[in-house]
């Protein structure tokens, strides 16, 4: 299998730590009449994204994880533009939604596919309810987010109540593939995501990375997935890998933790046991893949 070379992370932009919503909107609206100047348009998009990432609307706790999650560089790598229609899969507590919603608010569209309100798992129902409350409590930021439901048994063939006209420009998933692999519907879900995309649209994947050759059974229990498995399953669903990056790599992660990836921050599921060791490792070693939907 062809190996793509690692991509050097882009430098962070030197912008003020806090920008007002008015400043962010001004950046998002600037420069888009310059259709004949794609480089200028890309620069404006980069500046707008940096403004949102550095925006004062973000919680201190979320901003504190930027050094581990690299949101500016990751979203640039996926080729995201403010005019895009985007589906964010399984947004959890909304860490990335806090960035995507204002970035796409003026010119694009954000769809968030969360767990069902009546999901049989109490934790998932609670997560959905908390996400809905977050959106409702900040309409200035989230009033244009369209909330829908992830494909779950038996409705694998649709993203319930999410149907972007003409298809989405991008579908994004952050640290979710292992859940669908463990649940046994990764392949069906990937096909559903492909159907939601335009031909040539982007599928952005960030996932905890298992060591090459890790057995499937271990992947299902540890939360780490091999790159080869992700590439193979994505290709079978209609995606081609166009680039991969080491933006979210962590060479300190041994991937051999009691209770799997959840032993590491931010979950720290083992409590005080080896807590300092896990904090020293930091967040997991992760692959970052950019796929496109085949025609």
Annotate each predicted stretch with a short phrase:
Residues 1-19, 23-35:
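N-terminal secretory signal peptides
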Residues 169-184:
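A short SAM/SAH-binding and catalytic strip from SAM-dependent methyltransferases
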Residues 187-199:
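A short glycine-rich, Lys/Arg-flanked "PGG" loop and its adjoining helix->strand segment in the class I
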